[in-house]
Each structure stands twice: as structure tokens, then as C-alpha cells.
Amino acid sequence: MEAEMLYSALALTFAIFMVYRILSNSQEKSSLIKLPPSPPGWLPVIGHVHLMKNLLHRTLYDFSQKLGPIFSLRFGTRLVVVVSSSSLVEECFTKYDIVLANRPQPSVDRRSLGFSTTSVIGAPYGDHWRNLRKLCDLEVFAPTRLASFLSIRLDERDRMISSLYKISSAGFAKVNLETKIVELTFNNIMRMVAGKRYYGEEAEDDEEAKRFRDLTKEALELTSASNPGEIFPILRWLGFNGLEKKLAVHARKTDEFMQGLLDEHRRGERQNTMVDHLLSLQESQPEYYTDEIITGLIVALIIAGTDASVVTTEWAMSLILNHPQVLEKARKELDTLVGHERMVDEHDLPKLRYLHCIVLETLRLFPSVPTLVPHEPSEDCKIGGYNVPKGTMILVNAWAIHRDPKVWDDPLSFKPDRFETMEVETHKLLPFGMGRRACPGAGLAQKFVGLALGSLIQCFEWERMSAEKIDLNEGSGITLPKAKTLEAMCKPRHIMERVLRQVSNV
């Protein structure tokens, strides 16, 4: 036992010494090229990791106020460059769009979270990624494909509205809006994917639904967890890989679940689902549309269609509850352009300009992925006059850009009206990224949010739980959830009573 402990101690000492030498050499090389400035406090082995706080985007914003719109950090052996200005973002994704089209490849198995070489989110830039992106644009997120699922989206919207009506038909009632939005969004996407409902009343097979909900919950927890082994590979060699084991187990369970869906649809009659459509493509090109590729596409679709939609809708409702004048203006627009004889439809969304302004302003203040998905240059380049070596991780702090007083008037205030008179420029408002690696599901997410938000405003009166404003503190994670679940009081609008009774079959 003593010999083993001595061996482990010697191995750890040697490993730390080697990492220190590597980092020292990299620091010496860095001094020979003009890297973006770094904050003080760099330490051997760990770099700047100890300076990172719980909300990464806010920590990076604080650094940018001292160091400027571009700066660099060391996360262990990894060089990270952070961009925090709209002008530099425009430079990155116009001049260097192809160079920056790569993604950093995780050293651990994150395929069940959408980051893998078979996923359009995480695949390296090249022919394979171009094929995946083309498939997404033409087959998965194509307007005609999404239009074929319109009846599903309307039905799930009606179910949510009916549920709220039954809760509040006697007068103002307390509702957990987060729960309702999660049920709406995940049922929407899973009916499109596989024709199944896994949340709320009338959910499919209880055991299967529970498996899916458990996988979703675990995925959320894993995306919020940090993995020191990715920053310090030596920890993986020494066995400190608890998160990696959890990721591997989650990936295996996700693969088994998705394979079960594929096999079930192979055995059954073809339906209008994304799984059936992809399986038909597999029949024509089996060498390319493997089960692994199809699973990667489905996972990407689930992620693209749920995360942004859930958090954006919840933030939007929180903001308008704190600004009743915005809620009233949106309701008047709906009453004028849609009326009271029917509920708002997706076809109404293009003409509901103020509703769209609310969505844009929500995405500005609370982008669902505040530092976007990281990029990695495939060759050395210069950004803002600084050298950025090949293989650097590049983070774009969209949260900081969206609150930049040089770009936005009164940037910390919720003012949807600002978008009524200004043209949206993608390098200034980029909640879904920019360039060729922008999120392919942005259009679907905005359809989800617009329809849900418009329906909630049109059909119900809303009030806060008390005179106190809704808490707008942010929670932790890759996405930007609220720290506190949104609860509110609602009751049916008298003028919409007849429509609500029809939808609720009462």
C-alpha cells in the first residue's frame, strides 16, 4: 500500500512538473507573438481558471471592461480568445468565416448533448459537415417540412391553452409557467420527430416517457457541469474522470433510446415524422444515412427546437409581467390584427410586428446561449490586430455585445419599441450565432416562441404573484435559464371565452 502511495505521489509530482514546463514554454512562445491582452492572475498549470465565476458570460464581460473588446485567457493548456464587440464579430464572420468555421473537438464523449463528429452542431468543418448542414436546410428545417408539422404545433398550443383555461376558468389562478412551456416545447418537438408525447396528460407509454424525461433531465445537469479533465488532461490519466463516466453512461442510454425509436419506426407503418423521413433517405443511401448519422441529426433537432424556445418564452413572459404597458400594447396588436373569433396562428406572425419586437428584445437581453457555441480557427489569423493561433478556442460574448452602450441606447432596459424603427444587423444581435455555423434551427425556435407567446397574451389576463417584480436573476448552465421558476396568476379574457370553451371542449 505504501509503495503504491509513493508511486502515485511521484507520478503526480512528475505530471505537474511536465504540465508546468509545457505551460511555461507556451507562455514564452506567446510573448513572441502579439496575442490579445490577458488579465493578471495567471498561475502555473491552471492558467486563469481560478478567476472564472459561476456565470461565465458576466465574468468575461467584467474582463472586457478592463482589457477591451478582445482578450485572451489560459484554461490549463488551452488558449482562449474572447470577442466582445460587434465590429470584431463582423470581422470574424466575414473576413474569417471559413477559417473560424471549425468547432473545438471535446476530449470526452458529448454526443448525447449534440457535440459529436456526426452532429451538425459539433462536426468539424469540411465535406461531412457541409452534407449535414445541407440535409438540415433542405430536409429537416426546410419551410415545407416545418409546414407539414403545423397541425402538431397548433394542437400542442391548444392543449396548453386548454390546460390553463381549466385551471383558471373560475378566476385568477396560480400557474407554473415553466412547466407549461417545457411540456409544450418538448411535446411539440417529439411529435415532429417520432409522433410521441412524453409530457403532461395523455403522454405515451409511461415507461418510455419516463426514460425520455430522465434523459432530458440528466442532459440538462450534464451541460451545466464542468469537467476539469478537459482542461487538465493529467487529471484524466490519474482517474479524476467522474463526469466523463456520467457522460459515457448518458451517451449509451441515449443511443439505446434513439435506436429503439428507429427500430420501432422500421417495424411500423410510415408516418409523417422526422424519423420516418430520415429512414426513407436511408433506404436510398444506406452508406451515408447510417443510424449514427440519423441519431445525431435527431439529437441536434431536439436541442435546436427546445432549449432556446423554453428559456426565451419564459424570459419573455417574465419581462412583460414586469412591464404591463408592453403586455397591453402587444394585446392590442393581437386584438386588431387577429381579433377575438379565433386564436393566433403561425400565419399571423409576420404581420404581428410588435410581438416580434418583444421576442427580439428578449433575445437581446437574455440570449439562450450567452457565449454562443465556441469556434476554432483552422489556421493562424489576425483579429482586431492581434494574432490568434490555429487551434485557439474562440468565444463570442453575445450577452456583452447585446448590452453594449456603443451599439444600443439604454442597453439595460427592456424596450421592444426600439426594434420598430431600426433594422436588425446580425453582427449586433446574434442570439443564434452568425456565419455558416449559425444555428440551423433558429427559424423553428422563433416560430415556437412567437406562437406560444402570442397565444398566452391573446387568451389570458396576467398578473404577478405579488406587487414585487419578477426576479430576473440568471441561473447557471450553457443555456441561460432563470434562477427562479416563473409563476404567475392568470385568468381567461372575457372576450376570448367562446374560443377558449371551443378549444377546451367545455
Curated annotation (Swiss-Prot):
This is (+)-piperitol/(+)-sesamin synthase CYP81Q2. It catalyses: (+)-piperitol + reduced [NADPH--hemoprotein reductase] + O2 = (+)-sesamin + oxidized [NADPH--hemoprotein reductase] + 2 H2O + H(+); (+)-pinoresinol + reduced [NADPH--hemoprotein reductase] + O2 = (+)-piperitol + oxidized [NADPH--hemoprotein reductase] + 2 H2O + H(+). The gene is CYP81Q2. Pfam families: p450. It is found in: Membrane. Expressed in seeds. One of its GO terms (cellular component) is membrane. GO terms for molecular function: heme binding; iron ion binding; monooxygenase activity; oxidoreductase activity, acting on paired donors, with incorporation or reduction of molecular oxygen. It comes from Sesamum radiatum.
